[in-house]
């Protein structure tokens, strides 16, 4: 990847199609920040929900996650699903780069081997974007735990997602 600075914006040449993969159960404001920043850097961005649709795990189904993401991002951003190897999806769809957010060195330690494996399997690069510090403490798991016990999740999820999370835990 050949980054260059143009004004205050970072441009990545020859990388037009990007995928932001994750389970997004559910999507948080930290995720949205990374997705929006990727959308400024690349010509086409797809948020890719990963997992197995036949094995309900987590708080939201795959369809619910995709709907919540669509409600939370710019209409120009695509939302799709993948239950197989990420590199198979990226090869089939002509994706140039993966985008992942990093909150801390722990995220880096977790994401680096996956990025290296993806590169080994298909040659695809992964771009790591540092999470805005105001979202550094936010993870889907922690936020769900707060919501489960009736805590205030304001500022953790997009509004529609926050309402959906609260509704899930009312049941």
Predicted regions located by residue number:
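Structural beta-sheet core signal
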Residues: 20, 47-49, 128
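Short, glycine-rich nucleotide/cofactor-binding loops
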Residues: 18-30
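Residue-level signal for inorganic ion chemistry
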Residues: 28, 69, 150
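Short, surface-exposed acidic-centric catalytic microdomains
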Residues: 32-86
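Residues at the starts of beta-strands that form the adenosine-phosphate
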Residues: 17, 43-46, 125
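Classical nucleotidyltransferase
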Residues: 13, 66, 83-171
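Conserved acidic residues
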Residues: 9, 43, 96
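Single conserved hydrophobic/aromatic residue that forms the stacking wall/gate
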Residues: 1-12
